[in-house]
Amino acid sequence: MVKVHLIGHGKWGAVIDNAIGDSRYVEWTDSKDADWIILSTPNDLHYEQVSYWLAQKKNVFCEKPLSLTYKSAKELFDFADTMGVRLYVDDVFTWRDDYDIYDDVNHFVWTKPKQKDINYIDRLAYHHFYMW
């Protein structure tokens, strides 16, 4: 049984809550007892909140974006390594039909994007560090 604490119950927080629901594998709990903290809060709060929970030696699952810059995202992943905990970032759009993704073990390459106005470099910056 994994003990989880959800912070933020807006649009995506509600989706996460409903998706996990009454899972027999997950126990909703107070933050001090949690194995995992799930952050579904406004983007500009992510860096500070993730830093705080990593410092408490909690595993963190953060809705995208992890931070507002590449540098701060890298700092968070390095800090998670230092603290010996896990840090994951959700990007639900990665799995949509809009993208054909090729996994070359070391990097992802988008081919034939249907939506031309997306900044793909920024999308890579915050959630593909685990490949390094």
Predicted features along the sequence, with ranges:
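N-terminal Rossmann-like dinucleotide-binding module
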Residues: M1-K32
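Contiguous beta-strand/loop segments that form the cofactor/metal-binding neighborhood of enzyme cores
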Residues: R123-W132
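A contiguous active-site-proximal alpha/beta segment in oxidoreductase catalytic domains
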Residues: L68-I118, H128
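Beta-loop-alpha module in the N-terminal Rossmann-like domain of NAD(P)-dependent dehydrogenases
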Residues: I16, V26, D30-F79
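Short, well-ordered coil/turn elements that cap or connect secondary structure elements
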Residues: M1, I20-S23, A55, T82-G84, ...
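Nucleotide-activated donor-dependent transferases that construct or modify glycoconjugates
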Residues: L6, D44, W110
